[in-house]
UniProtKB/Swiss-Prot annotation:
Originating gene: luxA
Naturally occurring in which organism (per UniProt): Kryptophanaron alfredi symbiont
Record-given protein name: Alkanal monooxygenase alpha chain
Coiled-coil parts of chain: none
Entry-linked PANTHER family: BLR5498 PROTEIN, LUCIFERASE-LIKE MONOOXYGENASE
Any single biological process term in GO: bioluminescence
Length: 357
């Protein structure tokens, strides 16, 4: 079993930005002492939904402050920055950490990011393809060039080269079928969303495996990751109550982040995400409290035994044994770390990989 901790850097109303960033560093370091393998960092811009505009910089800090902890991005919005500049960042982190950096990528969801950084969001799929190809070639061969419709530059040497053979491991944050298929074609592990239930997780993995096998990949040893909102307490109601205020503000902040500009919903190529929101509305989840209640049904929020049952059910359905938990809904920094420690002592040891028998 592997266990990760994803760090939101959401700014709740009671904290200023200095406190959020300080807490990020402290929780990253606590991840190592609490037995987590990886701390995952999320990229966000122009909103309190996440204060981390550059996860590469934050990853460098946490890698330097820890000895064994892996640090990953979940995820870098790949199309919004130059691929060679990002390649240099990834290789440098890979070198300086001696292979402890994990490179999680996505094509992006927020119109605001593309608009401000001058990238055509409707072209995000093609840019994702091109940027990924350029970067992986540079990791493997040590030099890059490009002469396609998206970017042109002559052959250059990449420095530093990668520390890890064939480059830092790549993960893909995947929600839609098209992104799942894209990752499967390349045999890349995916990070599954915390907002989908057991059956949806299994269906996503079934789709992935079908496509990956068609492209000649061995699906038996791909390091997929399931993500969760997590709160552990011996009193189930207390675990749920302490999260509710945080999650209410966080969910509302997410909605605001998707619509900073009035015409954000006009972008082409994001039909899955629009459909997902329509389904949420039809299920009554537009109401914040109902959305939170549903989250509690599919995420490990409750007693240690309740958390074990929810996660183990997903492990048995999918075969995934890399579990990534987010604890920031648990209140103060002290309360967050207390929940992490209880997860370490009363949940981690009792989760088992799916038996192949």
């Amino acid at each position: 079993m592997k266990f990760g901790n994803f760090l939101l850097t959401y700014q709740p109303p009671q904290l200023d930005q200095k406190e959020v960033i300080k807490r990020l560093v402290n929780l990253g370091q606590a991840s190592e002492s609490c037995g987590f393998d990886t701390a995952w960092l999320l990229e966000h811009h122009f909103t309190e939904f996440g204060l981390l505009g550059n996860p590469y910089v934050a990853a460098a800090n946490l890698l330097g402050a820890t000895k064994k902890l892996h640090v990953g991005t979940a995820a870098v919005v790949l199309p919004t920055a130059h691929p060679v500049r990002q390649l240099e960042d990834v290789n440098l982190l890979d070198q300086m950490s001696k292979g402890r950096f994990k490179f999680g990528i996505c094509r992006g969801l927020y119109d605001k990011d593309f608009r401000v950084f001058g990238t055509d969001m409707s072209n995000s799929r093609e840019l994702m393809n091109s940027w990924y190809d350029i970067m992986t070639k540079g990791m493997i061969e040590g030099h890059v060039s490009s002469d396609n419709e998206h970017i042109k530059f002559p052959k250059v040497k990449v420095s530093p080269n990668s520390y890890t053979q064939r480059g830092a491991p790549v993960y893909v944050v995947a929600e839609s079928a098209s992104t799942t298929e894209w990752a499967a074609e390349r045999g890349l592990p995916i990070i599954l969303s915390w907002i989908i239930n057991n059956n949806e997780k299994k269906s996503q993995l079934d789709l992935y495996n079908e496509i990956a096998l068609e492209h000649g990949h061995d699906v038996s040893n791909i390091d997929h990751c399931m993500s969760y909102i997590t709160s552990v307490d011996h009193n189930s109601n207390k675990a749920k109550d302490i999260c509710r205020d945080f999650l209410a503000h966080w969910y509302d902040s997410y909605l605001n982040a998707t619509s900073i500009f009035d015409d954000s919903n006009q972008t082409k190529g994001y039909d899955f995400n629009k459909g997902q929101w329509r389904n949420f509305v039809l299920k009554g989840h537009k109401d914040t409290n109902r959305r939170i209640d549903y989250s509690y049904e599919i995420n490990p929020v409750g007693t240690p035994q309740e958390c074990i049952e929810i996660i183990q059910s997903d492990i048995d359905a999918t075969g995934i044994h890399n579990i990534c938990c987010g604890f920031e809904a648990n209140g103060s920094e002290t309360e967050i770390i207390a929940s992490m420690k209880l997860f370490q002592s009363d949940v981690m040891p009792y989760l088992k990989e799916k038996s192949n028998c």
